[in-house]
Amino acid sequence: MQFLSDNAAPVHPRLWEAMRAADATDAPYDGDALSARLDDAMGALFGTECAVLWVATGTAANCLALGPMCPPHGGVVCHREAHIEMDEGGAPGFYLHGAKLLLADGEHAKITPEGIAAGIDPI
């Protein structure tokens, strides 16, 4: 498997086959058996009821996961070499409704308390 950007990496053949098989079943958009099975599986994994939101790209998944956790006047702390900073383009600003990525430093792309303090200091 290649874990490149979702805009450049090919779809794995097994995933492609699973999508073809799913396309021949129920109507999409959460009223189907496949969505219900996924909700149940994630609920069992996390120990609570889950409603899975299907999205087309990893960029959308990353940004939609952060959006509910951060108000428009807030920020998300990440390393300045984090995937969301380096590879997601303008998507975080759009999906976070203006909230900022607050860039922190740290050795080997791991944030440190000092890096966080320096990253949020300009606020």
Task: Give the positions of each predicted feature.
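Short coil/turn connectors at secondary-structure junctions
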Residues: 47-50, 71-74, 97-99
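PLP-dependent aminotransferase-class I/II
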Residues: 96-123
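Short polar catalytic/cofactor-binding loops
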Residues: 7-11
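Conserved PLP-anchoring active-site segment centered on the Schiff-base-forming lysine
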Residues: 68-86
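Conserved N-terminal alpha-helix of the aminotransferase class I/II PLP-enzyme fold
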Residues: 12-58, 80-81, 85-87, 91
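Conserved core of the PLP fold type I
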Residues: 49-70, 103-106
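Pyridoxal 5′-phosphate
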Residues: 3
